[in-house]
């Protein structure tokens, strides 16, 4: 099913320790997350202004924050995998796109990894992992 409604988060700074760097390499000072969570329209277009009628993203953001602080990561891939697993707990999320990136790369660039998980893939992951 194609969803045209989503919750988007852009540029969330994560205080995490990822990778190892040599003496002459530029150390990233920021790791950031962009996230798009596809949800049903009835969680976006509401009649009554009540939190019970929407997807409360604050607990997920807190989960992501705690994951990012949980220790040293060798790769961005491991961190994005754990973030995806955190998304699985929230059944209002029907599909998800994640982009985790670091800056600076070579003084002024950004570099990251992205993953998009469809509704069918998310359902299979939930069945396997939860």
Label the predicted regions.
Residues 1-130:
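N-terminal, polar/charged subdomain of small-to-medium soluble alpha/beta proteins
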